[in-house]
Regions:
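Short tryptophan-centered beta-strand motifs in secreted/extracellular beta-sheet-rich domains
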Residues: 324-326, 387-397, 401-403
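Membrane-interface loop-to-helix entry segments
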Residues: 58-87, 132-140, 433-449, 497-504
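Interfacial helix-loop-helix junctions of multi-pass membrane proteins
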Residues: 112-143, 195-199, 476-510
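Membrane-interfacial, low-structure loops and terminal tails that flank and connect transmembrane helices
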Residues: 1-16, 93-103, 153-172, 459-468, ...
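Short, aromatic/His-centered strand-loop micro-motif at the edge of beta-sheets
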Residues: 365-391
Length: 532
């Protein structure tokens, strides 16, 4: 005879409703952490070079899958990742009256299939590695979650159901308004502090402007190629204007609104057409031949200012936005690791650096966040080709760094928001994960608020106007105010996308906490609950 698990006494279905919530949260977390950034490359050569169904990456040697290296810490995290999934799934299976052994078998099978599906999809994500070891460790994690449910699942569900009833009783409109005012007040202050770390407040005023090398003057970092023009702005350039500027061809015309502009025509010293920055003259071994259509760099010489560009640093600290455009042509792309542009001193980290690394372009600029624990360079692949001109523009609005090349904006952006600042306090952040940190940060801020609003929503099922006011004041207004606060800090532009993200996260929290509830009926009070 099959024994059904004992449900929560106060609400016969309330306890096991949490199995749905835990399972939804686990699946969402697993998909985000394993498939981010959700950019799939279904290249034909991958399918011919390896078998994705057997999780074999190209380069398989002696029966071993190349590129997948894991240690004990990775295995532990893979197990831990699937524990909530196994816990929630076991609750759903046991609610249907299945035996503990049946629940264990079903959880292991579902965990293995889910993990395999993820590993299969990771095969088509360039920054991810697939491997059977992840399937094994994830399946073990699902089993551990199932065993945890067998041991303490009902007690956990009863505890969560009791907490839910207490919060629901507390979540009157008045109490919710007071809590949210205090809650968002704290988050606004924390977010403003974190956002300030993306400003250009720590730029050195005594740095030199160098083209073709860095201020250290090391021959190993000297660049080979040709530069036609260089421009600076102390503001971000709108996307349409940036596309227009970089699609003009080489050498492109100088923009009349630029703060500083060099066209490298004629003979050195090259003057700034706006007379804002000092002239650039040759350093190292002065080249014997010159080109009237651009400055030629042979790896032994480079251009540098004799005086620091202190006014540029002061302007960037004040705004604090910038844009830089350079039109250049590399001589070669094999075995190259050289500086094309640098605002730097003879020693120490530069203010800004743009370098060629084979065919890749690497960009870095100084701010309090990028100076902590990791260099946070942005590497953009396959930008250069030998003896082909590239019109390049970077634009930074105080939070997002955008890249334009030859009239096209690259899809990915380098996003420095409060999420990156919070992540830096916890771990060594990675440039490829910057956008993901923002999603996590907005979830941390707005999902809990959405849960509280979801409790309040239950109390007004027959009040359309009251619900409308709740949506405007509870879901929409905090997200708008949050973006305004970060804008008022003075280091980022207002983003409608971020406002929408905050609203979406709040709605997700409200929907999640109401999983299994019939919101058309009023919430029963404790006095109306079934007797024990």
């Amino acid at each position: 005879m099959t024994t059904r698990p004992q449900p929560d006494w106060e609400d016969p279905v309330g306890g096991f409703r949490w199995s749905n919530r835990i399972l939804i949260l686990a699946i969402a977390g697993i998909l985000f952490l394993t498939l981010y950034p959700f950019r799939f490359a279904f290249n034909g050569h991958l399918l011919t070079a390896a078998s994705p169904f057997f999780l074999e990456k190209p380069g398989k040697v002696s029966g071993k899958v190349s590129g997948k290296v894991s240690g004990l810490s990775d295995d532990f995290l893979n197990v831990l990742l699937f524990v909530p999934y196994g816990f929630g799934l076991a609750g759903k299976i046991r609610k249907r009256g299945k035996s503990p052994m049946a629940a264990l078998a079903w959880t292991f099978t579902a965990g293995a299939l889910f993990s395999y599906s993820i590993e299969f999809l990771q095969f088509f994500i360039p920054d991810r590695d697939s491997g059977w070891e992840d399937v094994v460790t994830n399946s073990i994690g699902a089993v551990v979650g199932c065993l945890a449910f067998q041991y303490c699942g009902l007690a956990v569900f009863q505890l969560l159901s009791g907490w839910e009833r207490a919060v629901s009783a507390f979540a009157t409109v008045r109490n919710t308004a007071i809590v949210l005012l205090l809650y968002f007040g704290v988050w606004f202050a924390v977010s403003a502090r974190l956002q300030k770390e993306t400003a250009l407040s720590n730029w050195n005023s005594d740095a030199l402007l160098v083209v073709g090398n860095s201020a250290s003057g090391q021959s190993a970092s000297a660049w080979r190629g040709k530069v036609y023009g260089l421009e600076f702005w102390d503001r971000a350039i709108p996307d349409e204007a940036a596309r227009r500027l970089t699609s003009a061809g080489a050498p492109g015309p100088l923009d009349a609104t630029a703060l500083a502009a060099y066209d490298f025509l004629g003979s050195p010293p090259f003057q700034d057409a706006r007379h804002f920055l000092p002239a650039l003259s040759w350093a190292g071994k002065v080249p014997e031949s010159t080109d009237s259509n651009g400055a030629v760099f042979n790896g032994d010489s480079w251009l540098t200012s004799r005086d620091p560009v202190s006014n540029l640093a002061e302007d960037f600290r004040r705004t604090p936005q910038f844009a830089v455009r350079i039109t250049c042509e590399p001589t070669e792309i094999q075995g190259v690791d050289a500086r094309i542009l640098s605002i730097s001193k003879a020693s120490g980290p530069p203010n800004l650096e743009l370098r060629q690394q084979d065919s890749d372009l690497v960009f870095w600029f100084r701010n309090p966040l990028s100076m902590q624990r990791t260099r946070m360079s942005w590497t953009i692949p396959d930008v250069f080709a030998a003896k082909q001109t590239r019109d390049i523009l970077f634009s930074y609005d105080g939070s997002n760094l955008s890249f334009f090349i030859d009239g096209t904006k690259r899809r990915r952006t380098y996003e420095l928001g409060p999420g990156a600042g919070l992540a830096r306090a916890i771990r060594r952040i990675k440039t490829a994960e910057l956008e993901g940190y923002e999603y996590i940060f907005y979830a941390l801020v707005f999902v809990p608020a959405g849960c509280l609003l979801g409790f309040t929503w239950r109390k007004m099922p027959a009040q359309p106007f009251a619900r409308f006011v709740l949506v405007v004041l509870g879901f929409v207004l905090p997200s708008v105010l949050f973006e305004i606060v970060l804008f008022r800090v003075g280091v980022r532009a207002i983003s409608l996308g971020n406002i929408g993200l905050g609203i979406l996260m709040a709605c997700a929290g409200s929907l999640w906490i109401n999983v299994g509830h019939n919101l058309k009926e009023p919430m029963k009070s404790a006095a109306e609950a079934p007797p024990k």
